[in-house]
Amino acid sequence: MAKAKKPGMQFPSILDRAYSEYKRHLKVSDIMTSRVVITTPETSMAKAARIMGERHIGSLIVVKYGCPIAIVTERDLLSRVLSGGLDLEDTTVEQVMSFPLIKICPDLEIREAARTMIKRKGRLAVFSCGSLEGIITASDLIREIPDAPETSLLVDDFMTRDLVSARSETPVAEVVDSMGKKRIGSIIVSREGKPDAIFTERDLLSSLLATGSGLDIEVGKISSSPLITAPSGISIHEAAKIMASKHIRRLPIAKKNELVGIITARDLVEAYAR
């Protein structure tokens, strides 16, 4: 005789298992962003930043003579231009872009794409028969991370525990300089001594550079608030679901009402790629 199910217990149905198995074998072509935004080597970083900010994207493919040759990202903008003391108008994309492109095929399974992303440390350009078909980012991957055994790993084993923070009244210029030198994509913003918001590379692009605003504004005025957090001990699959549903790429982790770390989309991809 079959044992009765305990109250509250849930068992995956055949459809659930089939769907999970289907997601494990998704191809790059199933999840890639096919609308690729391009720029040229001669474009100023000021214009490139405005394009990224207006489109709410973190990178542009660089095309020369009709051929994709490189990529320029929000991290290039932060670390090589702003933190490096360069002028946005005087600096061209060619001076800071990353090349060659990291190329993958559209029929590659997403876990292999994740492994390539972590190994090569960058966004992936999808090519078919020599033609650019799309781009894959960490955000694309976490939206499709399947509920498989490898995604039951805990965020605590992959998160960054050394949190960097700034007071809400700190000028953005100072925060950006710190982020660039530490090569991090976000900083926790505190108000009255308590974590209140988060300032990210995307906030810099969309809230400031896309509008032509200066960097002397207080960081607390353009940070993302309220602060979205998750409890310590959740799986990377659960963290990925939160990020995807909230449209965020960085998730602070809390334990007993205290922040103990932060997990990023790239951290989740690294865990999934193992």
Where in this protein do the model-derived segments appear?
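Tandem CBS (Cystathionine beta-synthase) repeat/Bateman regulatory domains
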Residues: M1-R274
